[in-house]
Amino acid sequence: MLPSQSPAIFTVSRLNQTVRLLLEHEMGQVWISGEISNFTQPASGHWYFTLKDDTAQVRCAMFRNSNRRVTFRPQHGQQVLVRANITLYEPRGDYQIIVESMQPAGEGLLQQKYEQLKAKLQAEGLFDQQYKKPLPSPAHCVGVITSKTGAALHDILHVLKRRDPSLPVIIYPTAVQGDDAPGQIVRAIELANQRNECDVLIVGRGGGSLEDLWSFNDERVARAIFASRIPVVSAVGHETDVTIADFVADLRAPTPSAAAEVVSRNQQELLRQVQSARQRLEMAMDYYLANRTRRFTQIHHRLQQQHPQLRLARQQTMLERLQKRMSFALENQLKRAGQQQQRLTQRLNQQNPQPKIHRAQTRIQQLEYRLAETLRAQLSATRERFGNAVTHLEAVSPLSTLARGYSVTSAADGAVLKQVKQVKVGETLTTRLGDGVVISEVSAVTKSRKPRKKA
């Protein structure tokens, strides 16, 4: 007997093409770790090698436009991590992988974890600009979360002392490297938020390798920075070092020193501006006095030539009035300058964002309370409806009817018996009781007489 449909018949070319498409579409891009062997580089510049482990191996190719981005020369026996696409070389039917990138195994695994966590947090929206909190301007107190013995703390304190010696600084010491470092950094951020002593935080450390900076690529640290109510400035390593903490922080500074520059006022610059204004005022005063002195000299010379005592007295009186006016004008000018400085200081204080932040925090707390109350009310109503439904279901359940002494009898075909004409002698019946099932065989069928109607 022939099957209803004949099996598909492939040519070798079509088979290889189908397998290649399946590999490329189903597997996609994968990460593979293994040991390099049989490494060759022909004149074309492409790399051909075998990637193997203890029990298996696979042929690999890395084309010139991809391998020129590799920062090291692969060696026989070297453990590497590669990102590759799986494919099939159709002419020979050889299964192979096309390598897109290559890294030494240790650093490569860390880089892979870094990329995976970065993609995860980015998908959750932790890097979105809408969640970035503005930095206070000016800051009234700065919190520093770093190692108390590291160079980063020294650099931060040095810059703050140089730029704004009067700015209070609170240090939350923590480890920045090692297995315990992420947990300590998280606790330091939470402690700073609990105490609420400062209005901006610097979280960071000095430079180092990817392994040295790995504490700032920890998911716990990233979520703690995101959850911080106090604005956070990240300052990890050098300008070329970019960590997950940099993406989550409200502002990323390339170095710890740069972070200190960002959060502090340059009092030396303010002092230079005041000194410059003072110098300009002194120059104006000198110029004014020089002109008046020159005028006085000219008048005095003319009086000496004329020798009239009365005119000399009048000129002296006029000179005194002019000197008083000059002094009064200088005092008024200095007074106006002082008043303008006070107005500028008052406007600067009015721009303090702390009240707005407090109102926003209060609004968030109110919304959280309303959300919790709404959820509790909905949960209570749902539980009540569920209990009523269970009670109703138990009331109409046929099992309850059976438990009161009734039974249900069905024929061999499963039909429920309602009349004796449905049954024949010799048939097997199934009777369902409240606590089980009875199987019986019909030996006789008797139809009951209908009761007589009353006259």
From Swiss-Prot:
Keyword Disulfide bond found: no
Protein name (database record): Exodeoxyribonuclease 7 large subunit
Disulfide bonds: none
Coiled-coil stretches noted in the UniProt entry, renumbered to this chain: none
GO CC annotation terms, alphabetical: cytoplasm; exodeoxyribonuclease VII complex
Gene that this sequence comes from: xseA
UniProt GO BP: DNA catabolic process
Compartment(s): Cytoplasm
Its EC number(s): 3.1.11.6
EC supergroup of this enzyme: hydrolase
Family: Belongs to the XseA family.
UniProt keyword annotations, A-Z: Cytoplasm, Exonuclease, Hydrolase, Nuclease
Subunit relationships: Heterooligomer composed of large and small subunits.
Catalytic reactions on record: Exonucleolytic cleavage in either 5'- to 3'- or 3'- to 5'-direction to yield nucleoside 5'-phosphates
GO molecular function: exodeoxyribonuclease VII activity; nucleic acid binding
Protein's job: Bidirectionally degrades single-stranded DNA into large acid-insoluble oligonucleotides, which are then degraded further into small acid-soluble oligonucleotides.
PANTHER family according to UniProt: EXODEOXYRIBONUCLEASE 7 LARGE SUBUNIT (PTHR30008:SF0)
